[in-house]
Every structure is written in C-alpha cells, then in structure tokens.
Regions:
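Structured surface interface patches that mediate subunit assembly and partner/cofactor docking
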Residues: 3-14, 45-51, 89-94, 101-102, ...
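Intrinsic-disorder/low-complexity, polar/charged segments enriched in Ser/Thr/Lys/Arg/Asp/Glu/Gln
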Residues: 12-20, 81, 118-120, 129-131
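Hydrophobic-ligand binding "helix-grip"
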Residues: 70-127
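Short, highly charged C-terminal tails/helix-capping segments
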Residues: 170-177
Length: 177
C-alpha cells in the first residue's frame, strides 16, 4: 500500500511528478528536507503572486520545515520520505480555514468539514528516483466547483513549482559531499 492510500484513498484531484537522481534514497530524502525557496527563485515569485504580494515566510527556511506551519506530518521515515496533510478552502486567500486545523494524524483523518478540502503531499525517495504526489479530496459539491476553478488556474504553476523543487533537490543530492 502506498502511504497516500492510508491517508486519502478517495480524491478528486491529483498531481504527480518524478525525477531521476544519481544518489541513494537517504541522500535524496535529506536533499528534499534541505531545499528552500532560495534554491528556487521562480517558485518564490509564483508564491508571492499566489499570496497577492504577501511574502511566504522565511525563504531561507527549508520548504518542508516551513510547510509544517500549515500542515501536519502524517508519515515521516528518514531515508524514504514524508507525507504532509493540509486542510482548508484553498481557493481562498490564506487557505480560508476559519476553524482549528488538525494538529495530529488522528485529527487529520477525522477532519470532515464538507465545505473544505483535505490534501496530502508525498515526497518519496527511492533508488535513483524522487517523486512527489498531491491528492485533494473535496466532499461537498459546491466546494468542489470552487476548488475546480482554482485548480484549473493554479495547477500549471503548482506543477512548475514541483518540477523546480525536484530539480533543486537533485542539485543538492548530486552535489559532491
């Protein structure tokens, strides 16, 4: 079973990317955890636009560590990968989540606001390969329509950020020690 199947087996939207990397899974996983927005200037610009000019936190902080401020770690195995869970109305500026966000795996699994999304993001290191997969579940029909419009606009840019992230991780993983 894939880690994502445990956390979000039902989803309406998804995105996957993968990249060959000449390094061990442990080195690839370590690189994923070190990549920051300073490694990906174009991503910093895209996130700035997404946030309507508001900065995206500390651009020197590793992206995965920064993501923990708005997500919950669902699975984390050193040398293999990490799965993050997010909730909210992503089509709204700031994510739109007015209620408390899940703080634990159990709270994430139990989260069931019909007007909000549940999303999982997986960064997975394997022999010579790094992959990322995002899944989003939107249970409510009206919310799904709103998210679909958002997804149509944001997905190409989200995909570009993921590809740039994978390339930055590859540069770090393949760099001489």
């Amino acid at each position: 079973m894939k880690p994502l199947d445990e956390f979000l087996p039902v989803f309406e939207f998804s995105e996957r990317h993968r990249l060959a990397i000449a390094a061990s899974p442990g080195r690839i996983d370590a690189a994923v955890r070190e990549v920051s927005l300073t490694d990906i200037p174009a991503a910093r610009v895209l996130l700035w636009v997404r946030r309507l000019g508001r900065p995206y936190g500390d651009s020197g902080k590793p992206f995965v560590a920064g993501a923990l401020e708005s997500s919950v770690v669902l699975d984390d195995v050193a040398g293999e990968g990490v799965v993050l869970g997010l909730t909210g109305q992503f089509w709204r500026i700031g994510g739109g989540d007015r209620g408390p966000r899940p703080q634990t795996r159990e709270e994430f699994l139990a989260y069931d606001r019909p007007d909000a999304c549940k999303a999982v993001i997986d960064f997975r290191a394997g022999p010579g390969l790094l992959s990322t997969e995002t899944r989003v579940h939107v249970p409510d029909r009206a919310a799904r329509r709103k998210f679909r419009r958002y997804w149509l606009v944001i997905r190409p840019f989200s995909g570009l950020i993921r590809i740039l992230f994978l390339r930055a991780a590859r540069r770090r993983a393949e760099a001489p020690a």
